[in-house]
């Protein structure tokens, strides 16, 4: 059974988050949670928080055990951009785009080999 958790409007660029997301795909849920604790990027902290939420959803809503779960996929999509203006020469203004991301973590049960 698939279980998912979504973190919307995360204040990080999706481009910076996708390499962290790719690194945990296919791992056991608990192993991925522990690996992300030592990953030296801001995106790892946000994905770890979302992964913890997905594990809690599986345990509380679907009565699944954390040791039976693996990371089926982590999707990082673009969210809306905040626009800020910076004054430039001759009275003009430059646009600074503050990017956001939507992080979706999908967990699934491991297949039993019996």
Curated annotation (Swiss-Prot):
GO terms for biological process: translation. Gene3D superfamilies: Ribosomal protein L22/L17. One of its GO terms (cellular component) is cytosolic large ribosomal subunit. Keywords: Ribonucleoprotein, Ribosomal protein, RNA-binding, rRNA-binding. The keyword Transmembrane does not apply. GO terms for molecular function: rRNA binding; structural constituent of ribosome. It holds the Pfam family Ribosomal_L22. Part of the 50S ribosomal subunit. Belongs to the universal ribosomal protein uL22 family. This protein binds specifically to 23S rRNA; its binding is stimulated by other ribosomal proteins, e.g. L4, L17, and L20. It is important during the early stages of 50S assembly. It makes multiple contacts with different domains of the 23S rRNA in the assembled 50S subunit and ribosome. This is Large ribosomal subunit protein uL22. It comes from Methylacidiphilum infernorum (isolate V4). The lineage of its organism: Bacteria, Pseudomonadati, Verrucomicrobiota, Methylacidiphilae, Methylacidiphilales.
